[in-house]
Amino acid sequence: MRIIPRTMSTQHPDNAKVPEWAKSEVIEGEDEVKEAFLAYSMYGVHEVMWDAEGKDVDTHVVRKLLSNYPDYFREHILGKDLFLTYRLPNPKVEGADRKVFAETMESIPITYDLAEKFYGNGITIPVFEVILPMTTSSLEIISVARYYEKAVANEDELELYDGVKVKDLVGEIYPKVIEVIPLVEDRDSLQNINNIVEGYYKVIKPKYMRVFLARSDPAMNYGMITAVLSVKIALSELYKLSESLNFEIYPIIGVGSLPFRGHLSPENYEKVLEEYKGVYTYTIQSAFKYDYDYDKVKSAISSINNSRISPARILEKYEEDVLRKITILYTERYQPIIESLANAINDVSVLLPRRRARKLHIGLFGYSRSAGKVSLPRAISFVGSLYSIGIPPELIGISSLSNLDEKEWDIFKQNYVNFKHDLQTAARFLNWESFKLIKDIWKISEDTIAKIKEDIDYAESVIGIKLGGIDYDSRKHILMSSLFLLSFKEKILQESKKYLYEMALIRRSLG
C-alpha cells in the first residue's frame, strides 16, 4: 500500500509576507518550482498540489524538479516517498480552460518517461493522481478517469497509416490509468457526498479513494458554520460508506489560517486535528508557511505528519437532520448580508496585495436571487476585505443560532467543538467605528447594519465573546481599519494599500 500523505502544500495566495527566496512579491514561474522543492525539503511536507489552471501553468515541473535537484530526488523518490498532485481545471465549469485540462492530462505520460530515465525502469510513477475541483456528481470524475484511459493512455494503439501506430512514433504510453480525487465545494454536494463516491466506486472499482473536502469556499458561499457542519456530515457519510463497501476512503481537507477558512495555523493546528477527526491530509497553504517563524512552522508540520488519525464522528440520522437544519437557517441569515456588502468587498479586494501571477480558481458565489446575481472575489480576498473593513466574516449570521432549542444546541456544540474559540479569535478584530464609515462610503443600508449588529450582540451576550481590541495587535488592527476606511473615502489609495498590508501582517494572513 502506498503512503497516504498527511500534509499537502498548496499555492493558495493567502500569505501576507513574501518569502525571502521569491524574486518578486508575486510568486510565479521558476519560483513556484523552487517553492515545491522547498515544501518537501525545508518544510517536510509529504505532497505538493500543482495547480494546472491558467495560461502560465508549468507542465514541465517534474522535469525541472528532477534536473534542478537530482541529489534530493534520488534519495526521496517522487511518487513513492513524496507526491506531486495536479489540480485540473474542471472542463464542465471552466470553459476557457478546457484545453488546459487536456494539455495537463497529456503531460502525465511525459512525467512517467522522465522518471524512467531518472530512476530506472518500473521504479515509480511520479504523477498518478489528479484533483477535479467543483465536483458535484460521480459522472464528472468517472469522465476524467475514462478520458485519461481512452484519450491519453490508449492513443498509442491508434493506427496512423499502413500499420504504423502511434507507439511506433512516440513509444508506449504509461501510466495506463490515473486516480481521480473529487474536490467537493458546494453545500449540497458535501452533504450528499456518498452518492458521488459510491457512483465512482461502482464504475471504476479503485482499490481506495482520496476525497477532498473544501472548507474555505463553502464558508464564503454559505457562512462559516454551514461550512464546518457540511464537512462534518461529509466525514460521517464517508466513514459509513467506507464501512459498508469495505473500501478505504482517505479524506483531505482544504484549510487556511484564519478561522473563517479553517483555522489551520502553526499556533492552532492541534485544535484543528481535534476538530476534524477522520481527516488524513491537511492543506498547508502559503500563510501557514510564510507568515510564521520557520522553526514553529516546521515543528507544526512535523507534528501533523506524525499525529494519530482518529476515526470520524459518526452521526445518527437525527443528529444529521439537526445539522442540516442549522446549515439552512444559517445560510438564510448570512447570504442577504453578504449580498448587501458585495460592493464594499469587491472595492477593497482589488487593493489587496497580489501573491500569485494567475487567478487560481474561479468563484462559486453567485446564487440566483430576486436582485440578480452577486459577483464576489475569491475566498482569500473576500475574507481579507471583510477583516479590513472591521467586520470579521465569522460573526455574520451567528444570530440564526437563536432558533435552536436546547437539544439542537447540544448537538451543534458536540459537532463544532472549537466554535467559541474560533469566534473569539476573529471577534478581536471587530471595529465598531467601521459601521458609520461603510455606511458613508458604500451606502450600506440601515437594515443590513442592524442585522450585523444583531449577530454581534448575540455573539457577545449569548455566546460570551469579547468583542473588539483585547490586546495590542487587535487594537492596532482596529486603528488601521479606521485609517484604511478614511483614506479610501478620501481616495488616497496608496495609503489605503499600505494599511491593508499592515493589517494582513498583524493577522498573519491576507485572508
Curated annotation (Swiss-Prot):
Keyword Magnesium: yes
Keywords: Allosteric enzyme, Carbon dioxide fixation, Lyase, Magnesium
Organism superkingdom: Archaea
Regulation: Allosterically inhibited by L-aspartate and L-malate. PEPC activity is not affected by allosteric activators of E.coli PEPC such as glucose 6-phosphate, fructose 1,6-bisphosphate, and acetyl coenzyme A.
Protein's GO biological process: carbon fixation; oxaloacetate metabolic process; tricarboxylic acid cycle
Cofactor(s) the record lists: Mg(2+)
Thermal activity characteristics from the UniProt entry: Optimum temperature is 85 degrees Celsius.
Reactions catalysed: oxaloacetate + phosphate = phosphoenolpyruvate + hydrogencarbonate
Pfam families linked: PEPcase_2
pH dependence: Optimum pH is 8.0.
Co-factor binding details: Mg(2+) cannot be replaced by Mn(2+).
A GO term for molecular function: magnesium ion binding
InterPro entries: PEP_COase_arc-type, Pyrv/PenolPyrv_kinase-like_dom
Subunit description: Homotetramer.
Family: Belongs to the PEPCase type 2 family.
Known function: Catalyzes the irreversible beta-carboxylation of phosphoenolpyruvate (PEP) to form oxaloacetate (OAA), a four-carbon dicarboxylic acid source for the tricarboxylic acid cycle.
Protein name stated in the entry: Phosphoenolpyruvate carboxylase
Gene name, Swiss-Prot/TrEMBL: ppcA
